[in-house]
């Protein structure tokens, strides 16, 4: 939450830190935040907390975005909340959601978004950030204008029961990537 960002900012030597993508696009006041099929930890804050996290990420107090995907099946989602794992699934939602929330709504550049999604997480983990090179399979093609509807029936989609926005139109989609075989797609 925004108090945590303030605490990090006051540290003379800041520890590495990440924020979940879901905390950047949802708040406790959003209807999607009350879905019965998933819960996140820490819980979502209010809109001021979300704004504080976004500002902390943009000004470097928070280093990177974390996905922390945790797919649950239908049975697991039937358990009472205190008896199941906390988390939200849906890698395919991350780039479209953050594109809309940060690039479209808040004016971030594509480079700033990619930095917090790829380069800074690699650096935080002590890995060499990826570079686009001829012959590399480390690439993706994202269409920010393509609208699609996530469904568990899609052969390339997650089968997790705890993913947000099932059967709801989403704008922006990864349409191809080098890490997939020719038989599968990325969306």
Where are these regions (language model features)?
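A short acidic, glycine-rich active-site loop
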Residues: 38-49, 85-89, 164-170
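Glycine/Thr-rich phosphate-binding loops of Rossmann-like dinucleotide-binding domains
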Residues: 5, 25, 73-75, 149-150
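Histidine/acidic residue-rich metal-binding segments in metalloenzymes
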Residues: 1-65
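Short amphipathic alpha-helical segments
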Residues: 8-10, 77-79, 153-154
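His/Asp/Glu-enriched, well-ordered alpha-helical/loop segment
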Residues: 37, 58-59, 64, 70-142
């Amino acid at each position: 939450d925004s108090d945590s960002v303030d605490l990090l900012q006051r540290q003379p030597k800041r520890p590495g830190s990440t924020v979940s993508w879901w905390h950047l696009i949802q708040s406790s006041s959003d209807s999607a935040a009350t879905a019965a099929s998933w819960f996140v930890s820490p819980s979502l804050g209010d809109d001021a907390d979300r704004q504080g996290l976004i500002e902390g990420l943009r000004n470097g107090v928070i280093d990177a975005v974390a996905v922390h995907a945790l797919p649950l099946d239908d049975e697991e989602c039937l358990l009472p909340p205190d008896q199941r794992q906390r988390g939200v699934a849906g890698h395919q939602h991350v780039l479209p959601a953050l594109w809309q929330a940060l690039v479209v709504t808040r004016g971030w550049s594509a480079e700033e978004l990619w930095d917090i999604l790829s380069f800074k997480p690699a650096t935080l983990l002590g890995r060499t950030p990826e570079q686009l090179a001829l012959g590399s399979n480390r690439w993706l093609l994202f269409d920010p204008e393509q609208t699609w509807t996530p469904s568990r029936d899609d052969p390339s989609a997650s089968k997790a029961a705890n993913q947000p926005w099932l059967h709801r139109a989403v704008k922006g989609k990864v349409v191809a990537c080098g890490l997939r075989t020719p038989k599968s797609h990325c969306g």
